[in-house]
Amino acid sequence: ERELQSLLTKKSNWQEFAAILNQNKITVLYHFTEKANINSIKRYKGLFSWYYCDLNNIAIPFPGGDINSRKLDKRYNLHDFVRLSFCEDHPMQHRLKTEGKNLVLLKVKVDVAFFENTSFSDINAADSGHNHGNELEDLKRVNFDATRKRFVRKEDPDFKFHQAEILVKTWIPIDYITNINDF
């Protein structure tokens, strides 16, 4: 518990991160999940990385990603991060819905971006061409105009940039999920 709490320490220059998000009108972050996962999120009081869940025998009813995405997470040392997006209409979300998944969109306070170990990726962090890190320059690499676009098609030059990510180390406490009680 104490170890988890230590992950909530803010970056020393967190106000600079807040200024960039504010300049770009980012007021909420998003995480989509299968509706069947909501009870588990409530029970364990937050969103946890799949790696943390594995280590602590927390069963995820419908885990996101597959074997390949987990291999990529490990390759890029991102296996202990919870993925968030700047956009409400992530292309992966659309694909999963067409496959019949019952998804819900969780809204997360931007404050998680200020945690010391939170990183930012300019595109989907599973993409071999991504750049990620936890410095201000990494956040500045995000193409916020692309993240604000709606229903971006694969042919659009902003398709990859639309999928920029916020990578929160290990967990997001339930108090940061503003709409959890809507489900």
Task: Name what the model sees in each region.
Residues R2-F183:
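Active-site-proximal loop/hinge segments that shape catalytic or ion-binding/gating pockets
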